[in-house]
């Protein structure tokens, strides 16, 4: 896990945001606001072969850990790929393995 300061632009694809909202019930703008407010932790995406260069934010939404994979674009913008709930990270969070700063 690592902590980083976000002092940059954060964006997502509006079309993908609709899919995420319908499929997972997650509002990408709420996720974006949590990240901009510094309320997150982070980790690497484990499958770098399938997702080269991706990392992920870990944010708490309604008390549950959500993974938010992202890439950093050439201009330094953080581009959020998707968002999903994670039982694995929720368990690790509950066990105190990392902290999401509120």
How would you label these PLM feature ranges?
Residues 1-102:
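Ribonuclease/tRNase effector modules and their secretory precursors
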């Amino acid at each position: 896990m690592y902590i980083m300061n976000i002092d940059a632009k954060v964006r997502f694809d509006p079309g993908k945001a609709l899919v995420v909202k319908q499929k997972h019930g997650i509002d990408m703008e709420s996720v974006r606001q949590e990240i901009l407010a510094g309320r997150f932790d982070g980790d690497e995406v484990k499958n770098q072969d399938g997702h080269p260069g991706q990392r992920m934010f870990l944010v708490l939404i309604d008390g549950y850990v959500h993974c938010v994979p992202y890439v950093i674009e050439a201009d330094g913008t953080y581009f959020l790929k998707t968002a999903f709930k994670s039982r694995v990270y929720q368990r690790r969070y509950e066990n105190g393995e990392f902290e999401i700063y509120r």
